[in-house]
Amino acid sequence: MYRFAPSPTGDMHIGNLRAAIFNYICSLQDKSGFILRIEDTDTARNISGKGEEIKEILKQFGIKWDKLYIQSENLKFHRELASKLLNDKKAFCCFCSEEELAAKKAAAKKAGVAYRYDGTCEKLSDLEVLNCEKPFVIRMKKPNRILKFNDLIKGEIGFEPENIDSFVIMRVDKTPTYNFACAVDDMLEGVTCVIRGEDHVSNTPKQNWIRECLGYTEEISYAHLPIILNEDGKKMSKRENSSSVKWLLQSGYLPEAIANYLILLGNKTPCEVFTLDEAVEWFDISKISKNPAKFDISKLAFLNREHIKRADSARLVEVFGLDESFSELIKFYTQEASLVGEIKEKIKSIFSKKEIPAEFAENVKILKDEILKIKELPENFENFKEILTKATNLKGKNFFMPLRILLTGANHGPELKELYPLLRSQIKRIVNL
């Protein structure tokens, strides 16, 4: 069982989408099932509507979940299992105030050493705990051995006990921390494999330790994906537009192209252009590079053009909101535009009233009048050109530039001989606008 567990705290990052896609593909390969879990326990950072937005984005990418969980609905289980850890002496109540901890952290920094919890409250007797009326958090007891796990991408990874430390699992307000809620939910929901970003590597031993202390013996496999770098070779910030899946979709990149690119990123694939469904046939998580991958927006633009070319008429109607008769024209314009909006603008320009530059106005009118006189437009552009040049005596720039403006509303663009067959049936309507 695989899962994708985003938090509704902002726009979905492409790194998160990449993890969702990989988990989904692997769940289809072994038919184990796919869970979507909205991790909403950080109420201070939650943004209204983001949970639904996450679901809508996944649907656009064709990602279907077998089960949906809302993490906050598991709060009673989090508290029950935290209580079990206390009873089993695997966890303890910590009454240290924020001010006390801040002072200890400052002292450690001044001494040039990493801060570690000093175990003050772990030493308290049961009676001392009961008699203390101060607010408290619950901490796990630090492990007494190296915690190791085998990463499906990075290989074996180990963490010394001091790097695990006595970490907090329940806050003062009795809500679970990320690591505790995540560890418990994965256990309760039967998750068997987790694919996520490498920023979670240090969380994995903590989550494994929590489950071990709870007596859970089922193994969960992990794969941690290298980070995605921006085009400057730096870690991609959430503030960068291209890191937001919502922004990419609104900018005119197709879900098919984005998925294609994210699967291709840092991966060895048998071909360059493919769909998510096609990737299910050959995807291998172990072949993902251990090194960070650099995001290349121009490569994504190329893939966007390729997926527009591959799309059937029904899909193009859905994406562009244009009649099916425009399908070939849409594909034609991928030779000079990559985004949905750019292509729509070029087509809109053809079928709108033209702004004619004064220097071409006279020749445009001459060409328009002659085109409207032609009873039946010829099949090919050469014959069309021959008819017009004979009738108007216009040549070279005086012919081609006004004709291009009359037909497309643009000074530059694709070869008219290639565009003509696609517009032929509509040309009289176009010039009459």
From Swiss-Prot:
InterPro entries: aa-tRNA-synth_I_cd-bd (IPR045462), aa-tRNA-synth_I_codon-bd_sub2 (IPR020751), aa-tRNA-synth_I_CS (IPR001412), aa_tRNA-synth_I_cd-bd_sf (IPR008925), Glu-tRNA-ligase_bac/mito (IPR004527), Glu/Gln-tRNA-synth (IPR000924), Glu/Gln-tRNA-synth_Ib_cat-dom (IPR020058), GluQ/Sye (IPR049940)
Short motif ('HIGH' region): ranges: 6-16
Catalysed reactions, semicolon-separated: tRNA(Glu) + L-glutamate + ATP = L-glutamyl-tRNA(Glu) + AMP + diphosphate
UniProt-listed GO biological process terms: glutamyl-tRNA aminoacylation
Motif 'KMSKS' region, residue numbers: 235-239
Chief location category: cytoplasm
Keywords carried by this UniProt record: Aminoacyl-tRNA synthetase, ATP-binding, Cytoplasm, Ligase, Nucleotide-binding, Protein biosynthesis
Binding-site list for ATP: 238
One GO CC term, this protein: cytosol
HAMAP family found in the cross-reference section: Glu_tRNA_synth_type1
Subunit-level organization: Monomer.
Protein name in UniProt: Glutamate--tRNA ligase 2
Gene: gltX2
